[in-house]
Curated annotation (Swiss-Prot):
Catalyzes the conversion of 4-hydroxy-tetrahydrodipicolinate (HTPA) to tetrahydrodipicolinate. NCBIfam families: dapB (TIGR00036). It is found in: Cytoplasm. Its main location: cytoplasm. This is 4-hydroxy-tetrahydrodipicolinate reductase. It comes from Burkholderia thailandensis (strain ATCC 700388 / DSM 13276 / CCUG 48851 / CIP 106301 / E264). Pathway: Amino-acid biosynthesis; L-lysine biosynthesis via DAP pathway; (S)-tetrahydrodipicolinate from L-aspartate: step 4/4. (S)-2,3,4,5-tetrahydrodipicolinate binds at H157, G166, T167. It catalyses: (S)-2,3,4,5-tetrahydrodipicolinate + NAD(+) + H2O = (2S,4S)-4-hydroxy-2,3,4,5-tetrahydrodipicolinate + NADH + H(+); (S)-2,3,4,5-tetrahydrodipicolinate + NADP(+) + H2O = (2S,4S)-4-hydroxy-2,3,4,5-tetrahydrodipicolinate + NADPH + H(+).
Length: 268
C-alpha cells in the first residue's frame, strides 16, 4: 500500500498535535500539510516543533495549497472552519476525516451532501471503545425501553466550548433510534427550578466542565430497585487519533460516500 498523504487541520491545538504525532508514527502515512487559523502565532513554525522534530512541513493558513498536496485531510476544529475546509476538499477531491463537534442539522446536511462527491468519515467520536459502547447502548435501550428512566451524564475539560458533547448527543441519538423515536422529540437538556415530575419518555442530558477531563460519558438506566450504568472514560486523546487514522485507511480506494465510525469498524 502506498503511503497516505495526510494533512491536519487545527494543527497547533491539543487534538491537532496528537494527530500529527500519530501520523508521524504511522508506517503507512506521510504528513504533507498542517493547517492553522489565520493570525496564529505558530504560523510558519515546523509542525513537529512541539515534539522536538523537524518534519519539513510548516504550519500554514493556506487551505488551497494544503489540499493541492494532500489526499486526506483530518479535521478536528470548529464547524465554521470545517465547512471552509470542506469546500476546498471538494474542489481538490480530497478525502475527509471529520471529528469536529457542534454542527447544526443544516450543517450536518452539508456534510452528507458532500459524500455524494468525495469520500468522508464523520463521527463525533473516533474512539473504538466509544463506538463499541454505542452498540451496547443500542442493545440496552431495547431491553430497558419500558420502566427505566434514561439519563446521559458527560464531563469534559474546562476549554470545551459546546454542550452537550457530540458523543453524548450521539449516545442519545443511538438510544432514541433503538426505541423508535427522534432525539429532538424526547431530549431534555439540563434542569433548573421547579421542573415537575420526570416524564418517563424523555432522555435527560447533564454536562460537567472542569480541569483537564478528556472525556467521560455515562448512560444511566434507572429502574425501580436497580440501576444500570454504561460508562466510557477517555484517559488521553490517543484513542481519537488512532481512530482517525483507522478512518483514513478505511477511505482508501473509495471515491465517494458518507460514512461514520460504525462503518469503519464494521459494526452495522
Amino acid at each position: 500500500m502506498s503511503s497516505m498523504k495526510i494533512a491536519i487541520a487545527g494543527a497547533s491545538g491539543r487534538m491537532g498535535r496528537m494527530l500529527i504525532e500519530a501520523v508521524l508514527a504511522a508506517p503507512d502515512a506521510t504528513l504533507v500539510g498542517a493547517l492553522d487559523r489565520t493570525g496564529s502565532p505558530q504560523l510558519g513554525q515546523d509542525a513537529g516543533a512541539f515534539l522536538g522534530k523537524q518534519t519539513g512541513v510548516a504550519l500554514t493558513d493556506d487551505i488551497e495549497r494544503v489540499c493541492a498536496e494532500a489526499d486526506y485531510l483530518i479535521d478536528f476544529t470548529l464547524p465554521e472552519g470545517t465547512l471552509v475546509h470542506l469546500d476546498a476538499a471538494l474542489r481538490h477531491d480530497v478525502k475527509l476525516v471529520i471529528g469536529t463537534t457542534g454542527f447544526s442539522e443544516p450543517q450536518k446536511a452539508q456534510l452528507r451532501a458532500a459524500g455524494e462527491k468525495i469520500a468522508l468519515v464523520f463521527s463525533a467520536n473516533m474512539s473504538v471503545g466509544v463506538n463499541v459502547t454505542m452498540k451496547l447502548l443500542e442493545f440496552a435501550a431495547k431491553q430497558f425501553a419500558q420502566g427505566y428512566d434514561i439519563e446521559i451524564i458527560e464531563a469534559h475539560h474546562r476549554h470545551k466550548v459546546d454542550a452537550p458533547s457530540g458523543t453524548a448527543l450521539m449516545m442519545g441519538e443511538t438510544i432514541a433510534a433503538a426505541t423508535g423515536r427522534s432525539l429532538d422529540d424526547c431530549a431534555v437538556y439540563g434542569r433548573h427550578g421547579v421542573t415537575g415530575e420526570r416524564d418517563p419518555s424523555t432522555i435527560g442530558f447533564s454536562a460537567i466542565r472542569g480541569g483537564d477531563i478528556v472525556g467521560d460519558h455515562t448512560v444511566l438506566f434507572a429502574g425501580i430497585g436497580e440501576r444500570i450504568e454504561i460508562t466510557h472514560k477517555s484517559a488521553s486523546r490517543v484513542s481519537y487519533a488512532q481512530g482517525a487514522l483507522r478512518a483514513a485507511r478505511f477511505l482508501a480506494g473509495r471515491d465517494a460516500g458518507f460514512f461514520d465510525m460504525q462503518d469503519v469498524l464494521g459494526l452495522r
